[in-house]
Amino acid sequence: MKIKTPLTVKAFAKINLGLFITRKRDDGYHTLSTLFAPIDWYDILSFSAADAIEMSCTNPDLPVDDSNLCVRAARLLQDEGGVKEGVSMLLDKRVPFGAGLGGGSSDAATVLRVLNSFWDINLSSVDLHRFAVSLGADVPYFLEMQGLAYAGGIGDELVDLNMTIPWFIVTVFPCEHISTAWAYGHFHRRFELERPDLRALAPQLSSDGKTELLPLFENDFESAVFEQFGNVRQVKTDLLSAGALFSSLSGSGSAVYGLFEGESAAREVMAAMEAKCYPVSLTPPGFSMRQ
């Protein structure tokens, strides 16, 4: 089935609630333990029929050639399904890149999901998962999950926790682009430490008073990132000073989020961050990626 009329889809971002780097494998990859939670910050992807795979983007700093994850995802499906037609993709880039929010991974997952249907390839969930992992460790989450999920392995071993975050989430981008490679090269190793079981702790995070558990959800990248980027550290300080129950770096940064019980406090700190010209988003309690 060709895409007869332009199709527009949101590709939501995520934050990490806790992120423990557990070991370095022989192949150079690091294993981790983390929780992924969706946030109401998204890119918009538009698809229309074309003779070849074409890509354009509203952000001129992002490549639109075969190094782009969206293009790679489209080519994987085209080759696997023996598809003759192409697709024109327009990426309205709203989620900051180099922020630890998984925007590029979410975009790639959206391409896999949309084109698998509209090219009538109808790959199984197992095959789609395999393609997702080949594109990036975060991609399977955006392809398969909707709410809070536990991730192990390199981030690709997922468990749906069938729950959502019960607080307002304010997510701030301090205008620093931090590469994942830099973060892994500078984080302070703590492999020998016994770490909390994030998967077991997650169900206890509810609106009925388990906020005392939140400090257990540390991010192993924080100390190295905060040492190098003082403005990123300051965002966490500001969020906590504004009444956040908890604040943390997301992924390898530079985005920082705060969890708030009340909407008014969340909106006040949003205004303060916007006054610094920092992009910011507000996610309501109970948010999921189901549209």
Swiss-Prot record:
Binding annotation for ATP: P96, F97, G98, A99, G100, L101, G102, G103, G104, S105, S106
UniProt enzyme class: transferase
EC number: 2.7.1.148
Active-site residues (renumbered): K14, D138
Catalyzed reactions per annotation: 4-CDP-2-C-methyl-D-erythritol + ATP = 4-CDP-2-C-methyl-D-erythritol 2-phosphate + ADP + H(+)
Residues in the signal sequence: none
Pathways per UniProt: Isoprenoid biosynthesis; isopentenyl diphosphate biosynthesis via DXP pathway; isopentenyl diphosphate from 1-deoxy-D-xylulose 5-phosphate: step 3/6
A single GO BP: isopentenyl diphosphate biosynthetic process, methylerythritol 4-phosphate pathway
Nucleotide-binding among keywords: yes
Lineage: superkingdom: Bacteria
Keywords recorded for this protein, A-Z: ATP-binding, Isoprene biosynthesis, Kinase, Nucleotide-binding, Transferase
InterPro entries: GHMP_kinase_C_dom, GHMP_kinase_C_sf, GHMP_kinase_N_dom, IspE, Ribosomal_Su5_D2-typ_SF, Ribsml_uS5_D2-typ_fold_subgr
GO MF entries: 4-(cytidine 5'-diphospho)-2-C-methyl-D-erythritol kinase activity; ATP binding
The family this protein is said to belong to: Belongs to the GHMP kinase family. IspE subfamily.
Function text: Catalyzes the phosphorylation of the position 2 hydroxy group of 4-diphosphocytidyl-2C-methyl-D-erythritol.
Protein name, UniProt field: 4-diphosphocytidyl-2-C-methyl-D-erythritol kinase
Organism: Chlorobium phaeovibrioides (strain DSM 265 / 1930) (Prosthecochloris vibrioformis (strain DSM 265))
Gene: ispE
